[in-house]
Amino acid sequence: VVEQGAGGLAHTAVALLRAGLHLRAAVWATLACAALSLSVETLQNFLPARVPSNVDWALNTAGGALGAVLANVFQRLGWLDAWSRFRADWFAPHAQGGLVLLALWPFALLYPAQVPFGLGQVGGRALAWLEESVEGTPFALWLPVEQLATTPLSPLSVACCIALGLLAPLLLGFSDLRTLRGRLAFVPVLFGLALTVAALSAALTYGPSHAWAWIHPPVVAGFALAGAVALVALWLPRRLCNVLMLLVLAVLLTVLNQSADTPYFAQSLEAWEQGRFIRFHGLSQWLGWLWPFAALMYGLRAVVAPPRP
């Protein structure tokens, strides 16, 4: 409830800022950040491994106030109006959810994955959590643990998974872009961003000298396959792009969650979780796990919604 209230305050702040009420907008935005931070700190009272902190709440609130000041500066410089015009020219009117998902996708890629760009591999972890939760109870007999034999992915399967992992955000963007020109520009931007973030993740894990060590023939084949499908999808209607995105995500999640982890993947996780970037590895981990499922829900909603211009 508190988080929903914070979201409402944030929308109110933006509306007041656009209306010229800069001081009132800054106050509402700061209150929104304070309410959201307070809700998170309050929830930590119920988590055994977390300790709420008044200092964290104060710093988060101060960060919200700084953001409100910067928003006022951007508004006076005309940057917010320029973004509104750009969005109106390039994206569909109801593309808010898709834009949020596209903005979160690079951060989800930072956490090491079994397959590059293969987000959402949670089957093994979910099963382990279920086993621990129902251990010693009659429900333990319901888990078909021995039937879930997993095998490593072949190079061809890896290439296909990489292509599917790239096509999911690509089709999501296609479903929100208004023109063919926008789609043509979006393809190299997405591919370039994917390469950059994957290299950054490898550099954070193994060191800058190994930033491009993850590129091997299946990765190149996956990019080529994704590029070929993207050329075909350029002319597809927006609703069909959402349908194809749902199919892509369903296949990707099925294949990834039926494959076994390799020793190299376990080594990557150990290097990441014990490294200097442990303070934000949890956030990127949850984004990597949940992003495909959030995209599935967004795509389902877009498919069943009435047609929009």
Question: Regions from the language model: what does each represent?
Answer:
Residues 1-49, 54, 65-309:
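Bulky hydrophobic segments
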Residues 58-61:
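Long, hydrophobic, well-ordered secondary-structure blocks that form the structural core
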